[in-house]
């Protein structure tokens, strides 16, 4: 299969709803792009059902994830997650993890831990990867390294840690991948450092659309993945000493990087095509 742009974490239904609320014409056309292979995430049963239907009607290149989000650690969604696993309708569990960004979320820590542990166990039993959401809770993720090592792949959405922390997970035996997104376009230090220096076989790209917008934007779009990749490619080219590259050399470099990230996406989500 020809290498594609890959969006490792996006909210398709949320994006369409946001476009509708802003009275944007053709929300479907503005959401789907034939050059992008994506993983669409949901954390409520009803929304998953709608999103799945929309994706099936408008794209051939997608997978789905479902998880109990740490900002809304509701145990009532666990039976539905188990149902999806039984029916093999999802490629990953998540987003799940910890969010201690403010006092409100800190007060739900015990509930977050409970649904996190349930999802870790389900990931091990189903042999599916997990998509991790983590804000101000990296120490809690490190506490579960023994469990994470038993999981097929651990995909860190919105990676905000250092390269040292990323490599620490890898050295401890976690099959981890780290998502670079629009934080790169914002100039976020952690994203810049990781994008420039982390081994390329551990990097994924994402938009988190319609979220993670820039200051001048009202929302993000899945097609922003092309901007993310472009900046990532330029940054890595400079880091690798290709600052004086000619157009052809850079084009070849960018295509090789795109191919590498596509391969990472397939490995992280265990995607197999006929003949592969």
Short names for language-model regions:
Residues 1-276:
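Mid-domain alpha/beta scaffold segments of enzyme catalytic cores
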